[in-house]
Curated annotation (Swiss-Prot):
Organism for this UniProt entry: Pongo abelii
Keyword tags: Repeat, Ubl conjugation pathway, WD repeat
Designated name of the protein: WD repeat-containing protein 5B
Biased composition (Low complexity): 9-23
Signal peptide residue numbers: none
Lineage: Eukaryota, Metazoa, Chordata, Craniata, Vertebrata
Length: 330
């Protein structure tokens, strides 16, 4: 698969599903540190803002999920129950529930308000590494070191489908905005798009030199896929054509599965953690690095963007163990 930038590199990419596109914001972002959240006792693995914008969930190698206030970083509650470290956490669309993926080979479904574990999803034969809800939040998807992707029914906790997805650990799984498609990425170097209903593989995106795919995510409107590979590269794909549209570089990512994100509340940015302890922000259109956020003292494994405010949460590994909230005026 050609990885050259196809077509007009200056083509404006609309990410939002809304018809009324906001005009490009000309100024670069000016994110500044708002607060540092201390609570985890080992490496933080994932941070996610709730869809309603109220909360931030963090997961950690300390086997805990902590819920914080999204705006002030105030500690809310801790969710206990996993026997081994947690790699990922994700919110339901109504912000009432969370799902977590753990090295104990299970996923757990949590009630946000009570902090109670509602269900434990068992079936993977190795570490569960990544998880997400579909938009109606009646299904959960998970990826594992057992090289499969599983689709679970939230109501019953039963596994509905197992996709023999990859030939190496699955690093990331995500539904598109309609819930009709699933994207998965793997250390086997492949990014695959699946029909969520049938479990059929519709398309495979592959790079020339096949570096491990460490992260994948659909854009908010579902037209594009953002991939991260362990050769210090992020790429934006038009998956319907199987073409790479944009390449983002300058950060360091050769070892860890670092979360990346679309930031659409102000300007249109790509945001990622990095192994040089920084958060990188690129202009989505021009691919230029517009800001680097300095403050963490270890690899920034996860960066999340707030759904409505110009707010970024970042989290770092075991020499740091903290979460930082950053805010921008635009």
């Amino acid at each position: 698969m050609a990885t050259k930038e196809s077509g007009d590199a200056k083509a404006q990419l609309a990410l939002s599903s809304s018809a009324n596109q906001s005009k490009e914001v000309p100024e670069n972002p000016n994110y500044a540190l708002k607060c540092t959240l201390v609570g985890h006792t080992e490496a933080v693995s994932s941070v996610k803002f709730s869809p309603n914008g109220e909360w931030l969930a963090s997961s950690s190698a300390d086997r805990l999920i902590i819920i914080w206030g999204a705006y002030d970083g105030k500690y809310e509650r801790t969710l206990y129950g996993h026997n081994l470290e947690i790699s990922d956490v994700a919110w339901s669309s109504d912000s009432s529930r969370l799902v977590s993926a753990s090295d104990d080979k299970t996923l757990k479904l949590w009630d946000m308000r009570s902090g109670k574990c509602l269900k434990t999803l068992k079936g993977h034969s190795n570490y569960v590494f990544c998880c997400n809800f579909n938009p109606p939040s009646n299904l959960i998807i998970s990826g594992s070191f057992d090289e499969t992707v599983k689709i679970w029914e939230v109501k019953t906790g039963k596994c509905l489908k197992t996709l023999s997805a990859h030939s190496d650990p699955v690093s990331a799984v995500h539904f598109n905005c309609s819930g009709s498609l699933i994207v998965s990425g793997s250390y086997d170097g492949l990014c695959r798009i699946w029909d969520a209903a049938s479990g059929q593989c519709l398309k495979t995106l592959v790079d020339d030199d096949n570096p491990p795919v460490s992260f994948v995510k659909f854009s908010p409107n579902g037209k594009y896929i953002l991939t991260a590979t362990l050769d210090n590269t992020l790429k934006l794909w038009d998956y319907s054509r199987g073409r790479c549209l944009k390449t983002y570089t300058g950060h360091k990512n050769e070892k860890y599965c670092i979360f990346a994100n679309f930031s659409v509340t102000g300007g249109k940015w790509i945001v990622s953690g990095s192994e040089d302890n920084l958060v990188y922000i690129w202009n989505l259109q021009t691919k230029e690095i517009v800001q680097k956020l300095q403050g963490h003292t270890d690899v920034v494994i996860s960066a999340a963007c707030h759904p409505t405010e110009n707010l970024i949460a970042s989290a770092a590994l075991e020499n740091d163990k903290t979460i930082k909230l950053w805010m921008s005026n635009h």
